[in-house]
């Protein structure tokens, strides 16, 4: 028994991935009949080029690969699905098991930093003028010698 999927289902997968508008490299697999591969690649090329293709294949050097009916689409309903639910389930389990061992691509996560992360160490407005500032707080307020402006002329102020 072999897993069979119509090329239209395969083409729908390509159409779905294409919607992400990311660079896309489409490569072949194996284990197909040459007639179905010709149809599959023709349909997928049409999808990738945003071109609607007619069902009739015009005369060309590769027409023999579209035998026996020389049309793009395979008439549905004549292929019996011999796949059992347990077989499909076993394929799914195997795929998920294989995916578990694939190294993920390193990336920088794009997450919003929670606002409570930015807790100011010192806020002049909340300071009580009747309470002395301890040495540790004063040390945090050192003004660098290379800071020339502190006010309206400060170009770094937003």
Curated annotation (Swiss-Prot):
Enzyme class: hydrolase
Listed name of the protein: Histone deacetylase 17
GO biological process, one term: chromatin organization
EC number: 3.5.1.98
Gene3D superfamilies for this protein: Histone deacetylase domain
Species of origin: Arabidopsis thaliana (Mouse-ear cress)
Reactions accelerated catalytically: N(6)-acetyl-L-lysyl-[histone] + H2O = L-lysyl-[histone] + acetate
An example Gene Ontology CC term for this record: nucleus
Keyword Nucleus in annotation: yes
Compositionally biased residues, Basic and acidic residues: 129-146
């Amino acid at each position: 028994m072999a897993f069979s999927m119509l090329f239209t289902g395969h083409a729908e997968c390509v159409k779905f991935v294409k919607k992400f508008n990311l660079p896309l490299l489409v490569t072949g697999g194996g284990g197909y009949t040459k007639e179905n591969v010709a149809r599959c690649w023709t349909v997928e090329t049409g999808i990738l080029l945003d071109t609607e293709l007619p069902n009739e294949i015009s005369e060309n050097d590769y027409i023999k690969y579209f035998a026996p009916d020389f049309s793009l689409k395979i008439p549905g309903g004549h292929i019996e699905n011999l796949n059992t639910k347990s077989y499909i389930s076993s394929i799914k389990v195997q795929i998920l098991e294989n995916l578990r061992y694939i190294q993920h691509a390193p990336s920088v996560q794009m997450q919003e930093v929670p606002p409570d992360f930015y807790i100011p160490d010192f806020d002049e407005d909340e300071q009580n003028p009747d309470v002395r500032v301890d040495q540790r707080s004063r040390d945090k307020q050192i003004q660098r010698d290379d800071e020339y402006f502190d006010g309206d002329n400060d170009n770094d102020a937003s």
